[in-house]
Amino acid sequence: MTDQHSFETLAIHAGNTADPLTGAVVPPIYQVSTYKQDGVGGLRGGYEYSRSANPTRTALEENLAALEGGRRGLAFASGLAAEDCLLRTLLTPGDHVVIPDDAYGGTFRLFAKVASRWGVEFSVADTSDVAAVRAAITPRTKAVWVETPSNPLLGITDIAAVADVARQAGARLVVDNTFASPYLQQPLALGADVVVHSTTKYMGGHSDVVGGALVVNDKGLAEELAFHQNAMGAVAGPFDAWLVLRGIKTLAVRMDRHTENAGRIAELLTRHPAVTQVLYPGLPDHPGHEIAAKQMRAFGGMVSFRVRGGEQAAVDVCNRAELFTLGESLGGVESLLEHPGRMTHASAAGSPLEVPADLVRLSVGIENGDDLLADLAQALG
């Protein structure tokens, strides 16, 4: 398998070599903690203990690297475990990070409640504004953190432009690519140093696994991250790794359907009198539309909107939905909706990252589009 193959082919075959003993075309689940050695130090394939390495996890990590066009992929027990490993690898007490002013609530909590306790400082900036990012950088800035599209406001950051700003400051650019997936966007090719994923979401794609990933190109950074991954221990288990690998095989076809349905829903919302604003980068009037069109293959399956009537009206929409399941997370084959202010982003309440109280976030699934439109129309009233 080479990088000359198309994304769809890599998704199915990269890291997925046939089992040498049986010829099984799907990598086995190596549900094992330790490995027999051929004499002291005589490791087979470098495997000694599954926290350090496991063949099923290796297959996933090779696949992740291929899909993002990176040198090394690392799989973790959750997206936040991946982020924590990255912070501990890149930063020391007194260092500074620029994060988005609309970051995922869990990421904000990690910086505000955990990293800050061991001396890491951060400031927030509108990362869709390159000048604002530049202004937020200090002499102690070691990383610029970007989500694009962002969660839950669907903001778009020009990855290449911010990469230049970070590079000039001697800082690394970290891009959370969860909302886009590597099928729609490949940040390393645009100048990012690190790509972060919650593989729970589109990569797994079936709402049955929790996982995270980091992908990098720099060999030295890859080795440092691998050291911390092993030292900290929050690795993906073999069954979880296998589930993500299984999900990735259909990532391309799923993302095409997610995007198709999301585009139709965004158009419906723009015409509905109960909606005051639609946040979807595929709409021509979205402020990041042109940049998204430049750096993404398509616009993805996430849509947020604001409801006329305020917070209670937004909550009522969530409660009236039937086909859209009220729940947190995103990226599965089934459609979900939530009230971010009371659910996924409750930890940002009272902070500069607090989300609008009238906001509803949709994770648009791959069901029949007409069925989804009908359910949303009745939920809006």
Report each predicted region and the residues it spans.
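N-terminal glycine-rich, Lys/His-bearing helix-loop that initiates the first secondary-structure elements
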Residues: 1-47
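Conserved PLP-enzyme active-site core in the AAT-like
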Residues: 2, 13, 72-274, 279
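Positively charged, small/polar-rich N-terminal and surface patches that mediate targeting and assembly
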Residues: 2-4, 8, 55, 277, ...
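Conserved N-terminal alpha-helix of the aminotransferase class I/II PLP-enzyme fold
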Residues: 34-84, 106-113
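PLP-dependent enzyme catalytic core of the Aspartate aminotransferase-like
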Residues: 112, 121-123, 139-142, 319, ...
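A common structural junction motif
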Residues: 232-233, 320-329, 379-381
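Short, well-ordered beta-strand elements within core beta-sheets of diverse protein domains
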Residues: 244-253, 300-308, 361-365
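Conserved small-domain helix->loop->beta segment predominantly found in fold-type I
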Residues: 263-322, 326-328, 347-354
